[in-house]
């Protein structure tokens, strides 16, 4: 992960990042309402809003973010709400073995993948097949771009080898607050 990028995220978390709304996305709330609790991994969890919603619904949750400030906020929110979530400061392309040795019923990524470089995306996707449990789901939200850009935008449809274990089950196109194309994806084993 680029050092400048990491520092910029740390600076955002000294204030209040614009993406930290404190609102659980409707797609995540719908998933929680329609699936029994299991084991979840929240990649790029930020301040833990979705991780805590999953824990509140009975899920065993591990949240990962490379910004120490984000994880500090997430741990504080968990403590104040009386919820248990295993939060880690880590790079999603180099996860600790304690995380890699578990398989998850849900791997959630809200805006992490789309910020990775093409090489980092390849590394992330290579590890994904081992993280999602049989019958599990990888839910992804990101800016969606039809063309390739070097560092920003989700081109998961082009990059993910559909011959792998995970298959796209649904996609919901939308627009973010700045009218930038975005999409939710759900891949299942």
Explain the meaning of each model-derived region:
Residues 108:
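A conserved beta-strand element that flanks and buttresses the S-adenosyl-L-methionine
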Residues 1-41, 47-102, 116-131, 136-189:
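Class I (Rossmann-like) S-adenosyl-L-methionine-dependent methyltransferase catalytic domain
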Residues 111-115:
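Short catalytic micro-motifs in class I SAM-dependent methyltransferases
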